[in-house]
A protein has these predicted regions:
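Basic/polar N-terminal segments that are highly enriched at the extreme N-terminus
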Residues: 1-6
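A glycine-rich, hydrophobic loop/mini-helix early in the fold
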Residues: 44-75
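Short loop segments at secondary-structure junctions
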Residues: 27, 32-33, 54-56, 65, ...
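Acidic, metal-coordinating catalytic segment for phosphate/diphosphate chemistry
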Residues: 7, 11-49, 55
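Conserved hydrophobic/aromatic beta-strand scaffold that supports enzyme active sites
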Residues: 23-27, 61, 125-127
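Residue-level structural signal for beta-strand termini and adjacent loop
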Residues: 40-41, 65, 114
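Unchanged
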Residues: 37, 47-49, 54, 79-136
């Protein structure tokens, strides 16, 4: 099996920049020589997800309305990693902010690129076992 080769970036233009989403149009040349004059890339911040399990074995999930999907759904506690935070620091902060839970034994579960064909960010997932409600 051949090792994939990088594409050559010929030009890049930002279409818009917002704190939560930036879009750019790249002009690239593939290893075969074929050029793609409009390859769109979305730049999102990295985020973290938390699989949080209580001492009694219950998983902490939450319901939130998500406008892009037009519905209320269940999801894991999650959020954007702020500047200067490590992924673990962000995960601990997000779990507490969104659910009021904390403590427990934390471990890194995985880091993935959620949509590497068009997005440049990473999602860091943590497993927190033995979480409990935290008082202020």
């Amino acid at each position: 099996m051949k090792t994939p080769q990088n594409w050559q970036l010929l030009d890049s233009e930002y279409l818009f920049r917002y704190p939560w989403l930036t879009a750019r149009r790249d002009h690239v040349r593939l290893p075969s020589g074929v050029e793609i004059p409009e390859y769109f890339v979305l730049e999102y911040p990295d985020w973290c997800n938390i699989i949080a399990i209580t001492h009694s074995g219950q998983m902490i999930i939450e319901q939130q309305y998500r406008h892009a999907q037009g519905r209320v759904g269940y999801e894991l506690p999650a959020g954007v990693i702020e500047n200067g935070e490590t992924p673990l620091e962000a995960a601990r902060r997000e779990l507490y902010e969104e659910t009021g839970y904390g403590h427990g034994q934390w471990s890194h579960f995985m880091t993935i690129s959620p949509n590497p064909g068009s997005c440049n960010n990473y999602s860091h997932t943590f497993l927190a076992i033995g979480v409990e409600p935290v008082s202020c």
